[in-house]
Regions:
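N-terminal export leaders
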Residues: 3-9
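Thiol-based oxidoreductase modules, predominantly thioredoxin-like and allied folds used
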Residues: 68, 73-87
Length: 130
């Protein structure tokens, strides 16, 4: 069976559109410089420790996507840390496990949770950045 280039590209594009939920806040991979700049700017920050094989992380993703798209979290700077490949970032934020969520108000850590998949408590955690 052969597929046209157009059909393959259409499917790939549809997968990107359906699979990706845009967050209102800025999202970036964790870098020490980016994290420090956000802290110095006094931004509300979420550091999300994830792993592609982690079922709890997969359960947290739609909750975070929904909450981060709310207008009150529009200025939230989200830094994603890959548990397997960014060990230096884990040390920087003193995280020991995947599915860890850490929130900051500027340079001050204001909350942390590990393995939380309750929308209400994740929302309460993010609200601490406001």
């Amino acid at each position: 069976m052969s597929y046209s280039r157009r059909a393959i590209l259409s499917l790939a594009l549809a997968g990107c559109v359906i699979g990706g939920v845009a967050m209102a806040g800025e999202s970036a991979s964790f870098t020490p410089a980016g994290f420090e700049a956000a802290q110095k700017a006094g931004k509300p920050i979420l550091v999300e420790i994830t792993a592609p094989w982690c079922p709890t992380c997969r359960a947290q993703a739609p909750i975070l996507n929904e909450l981060c798209s709310e207008p009150r979290f529009k200025n939230l700077q989200v830094f994603a840390v890959d548990f397997d490949s960014q060990k230096d970032a884990l040390l920087a934020v003193r995280a020991q496990r995947q599915s860890t969520l850490i929130v900051f108000k500027g340079a001050t850590e204001v909350g942390r949770s590990v393995g939380d998949t309750s929308k209400a408590s994740v929302e309460a955690l993010l609200a601490k950045t406001l």
